[in-house]
A protein has these predicted regions:
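A well-ordered secondary-structure block
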Residues: 77-157
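Short, well-ordered surface patches within globular domains
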Residues: 19-83, 129, 133-135
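Sec/Tat signal peptide C-region and signal peptidase I cleavage site
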Residues: 14-18
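Sec-dependent N-terminal signal peptides
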Residues: 4-13
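Short, solvent-exposed mixed-charge patches
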Residues: 160-161
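Residues that line or immediately flank small-molecule/substrate-binding pockets and catalytic motifs
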Residues: 8, 48, 138
Length: 161
């Protein structure tokens, strides 16, 4: 399994409005699907099990301010299976940004999606044609103010037969 991580360095000076995290998560799915369509790849749809997987891990990253695909001692595949996602394909993108100032909803989503698009490994995950499901979470650390983002991609085992 390939593992990729990246850091987003944002400079959005003077932005005072706080991001609506649920809207950011929706916008990440929309931005991902827009990118997939531009590249001739079908859409991914939100999956509740992958959403729970992404949320649990993003919350862990934000709580501990650790940043690694295995930060909790588990792989993305093990985390997905623990939430009931029986897969033949699973992949994970993670990101965080260093700037703890306020962000608009659209700016935060746009920067996260663009960062993944610009990273070869994350781009591969985003454009994996066999992936049909996604789960997204964005959580802000109470300690550092960093935003941690997790995007899961997958395909259920039943769909691979």
């Amino acid at each position: 399994m390939r593992r990729f991580a990246f850091f987003v360095f944002l400079s959005l000076s003077g932005v005072a409005q706080a991001a609506d995290i649920v809207a950011v998560e929706r916008a990440i799915v929309e931005g991902t699907n827009r990118f997939r369509h531009e590249q001739g790849v079908g859409s991914v749809r939100p999956d509740s099990m992958l959403d729970r997987t992404a949320h649990e891990f993003a919350e862990y990253l934000a709580r501990t301010d650790r940043f690694d695909h295995g930060a909790d001692g588990r792989t993305p595949a093990i985390r997905a299976r623990a939430h009931g996602y029986d897969y033949c394909l699973v992949a994970e993108n993670i990101a965080y940004q260093f700037d703890s100032r306020g962000f608009t909803t659209s700016a935060l989503a746009r920067e996260l999606v663009q960062g993944w698009k610009d990273s070869p490994g994350h781009r591969r995950n985003m454009l994996e044609a066999r992936a049909v499901d996604t789960g997204v979470a964005v959580v802000q650390s109470r300690h550092s103010g960093r935003f941690y983002a997790v995007q899961m991609f997958g395909r259920r085992r039943a769909a691979c037969r």
